Amino acid sequence: MKQRITVAGDSDNYQLLKAYDVNISGLVSTPMQNEARRLRPERWKVANQEGMAEVARFIEMNGSFADENRDW
């Protein structure tokens, strides 16, 4: 869902882009998407750190379920 936001920028650059009918929202949206894509995995890791540690402890104590199927 798109939401209206306010962005501060250089007035001269804004006027030039506006004069050439450049889609300023598109210019801003792409870097925001890229940054959000970079931050989501970091947030997930922090939120799930305790669960991942518990899985690691379980595997350390009991081994992996796939260990018996390994051919190497």
From Swiss-Prot:
Alphabetized Pfam families for the sequence: CcdA
Signal peptide range in chain numbering: none
InterPro entries assigned to the protein according to its UniProt record, in alphabetical order: Post-segregation_anti-tox_CcdA
Molecular function terms, GO-annotated: DNA binding
Annotated keywords: DNA-binding, Plasmid, Repressor, Toxin-antitoxin system, Transcription, Transcription regulation
Complex formation: Homodimer in solution and when bound to DNA. Forms a complex with toxin CcdB; the CcdA-CcdB(2) trimer is sufficient for rejuvenation, whereas maximal operon repression occurs with CcdA(2)CcdB(2).
Function recorded in the entry: Antitoxin component of a type II toxin-antitoxin (TA) system which inhibits the post-segregational killing (PSK) of plasmid-free cells, also referred to as a plasmid addiction system. Binds to and blocks the activity of CcdB; will also remove bound CcdB protein from the CcdB-GyrA complex by forming a CcdA-CcdB complex, a process termed rejuvenation. Functions as a transcriptional corepressor for the ccdAB operon, repression also requires CcdB.
Similarity annotation: Belongs to the CcdA antitoxin family.
Protein name as catalogued: Antitoxin CcdA
